Amino acid sequence: MEAVQKIKCINRAWFVLSFEVVGPNGHSLSSDDLPIQREGILDLTEGGFPEGTEVVLRVKAAMGKALAAAEKLRVARNGKTAVFEVRGTSLDFRVELVAIREAEE
């Protein structure tokens, strides 16, 4: 399980979406609406998640379904970013982890 500080979601789908990061105790951190071909980023440490917490990304299509990523992540103050891409249509889409980026200096 990768340890990251931030989660980036890139909308490569054909719909407006929003995304949230959810912890085991129900605590969550949500994005604003993310238009087509845009990206958003959430800093987990600024969102109130303690280090070591396991979280999962959940994507919701506007007027469509919601889908969780297959990968769980662990919160850490290490500057790393998990990058996810969303592709498909509002009723048939996938959420894919495409990279773990190192901290930028």
Predicted region positions:
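Intrinsically disordered, low-complexity segments enriched in small/polar residues
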Residues: 1-105
